[in-house]
């Protein structure tokens, strides 16, 4: 790939922003509408992979100092803990609880443990997909 491919790099910056925004929307809409942690994680992963294709892998990893293997482990652990912790309070595995919280700028917000579980899924999916793709491509995993 040419080092001075201005069009590709410019379009990539715009498309990555759109992909990250859409992935965040899919993540948040997932417990009430189609979407969720898995598909949101895949869209986030596609944004990272597009950056790796348009820019040098090493350059992107320097700009985003993320260890995707650690991200995968943290996501799996977060989802596992969200599923197991209710058992310590006499509730069944994967018990869901929710609450309405008054936040200063947002007003009343509905919070659920499903959102925390789905956040773990997002982190795990991004970690797995990017690690596998970097391993296949020969980049640092």
UniProtKB/Swiss-Prot annotation:
Localization, UniProt: Cell membrane
InterPro entries the record matches: CPA3_antiporter_subunitB, MnhB
PANTHER family, A to Z: NA(+)/H(+) ANTIPORTER SUBUNIT B, NA(+)_H(+) ANTIPORTER SUBUNIT B
Species of the source: Staphylococcus saprophyticus subsp. saprophyticus (strain ATCC 15305 / DSM 20229 / NCIMB 8711 / NCTC 7292 / S-41)
Pfam family, one: MnhB
Example GO biological process: monoatomic ion transport
Keywords in alphabetical order: Antiport, Cell membrane, Ion transport, Membrane, Transmembrane, Transmembrane helix, Transport
GO molecular function: antiporter activity
The name this protein goes by in its record: Putative antiporter subunit mnhB2
Transmembrane domains' residue ranges: 10-30, 35-55, 70-90, 116-136
Its membrane topology: Multi-pass membrane protein
């Amino acid at each position: 790939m040419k080092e001075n491919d201005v069009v590709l790099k410019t379009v990539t910056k715009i498309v990555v922003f759109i992909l990250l925004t859409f992935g965040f929307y899919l993540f948040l809409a997932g417990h009430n509408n189609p979407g969720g942690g898995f598909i949101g994680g895949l869209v986030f992963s596609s944004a990272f992979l597009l950056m790796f294709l348009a820019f040098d892998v090493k350059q992107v990893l320097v700009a985003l100092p993320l260890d995707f293997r650690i991200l995968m482990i943290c996501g799996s652990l977060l989802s596992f803990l969200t599923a197991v912790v209710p058992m310590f309070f006499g509730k069944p595995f994967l018990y869901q609880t929710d609450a309405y919280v008054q936040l200063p700028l947002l007003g009343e917000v509905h919070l659920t443990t499903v959102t925390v579980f789905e956040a773990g899924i997002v982190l795990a999916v991004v970690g797995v997909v990017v690690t596998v793709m970097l391993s296949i491509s020969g980049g640092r995993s």
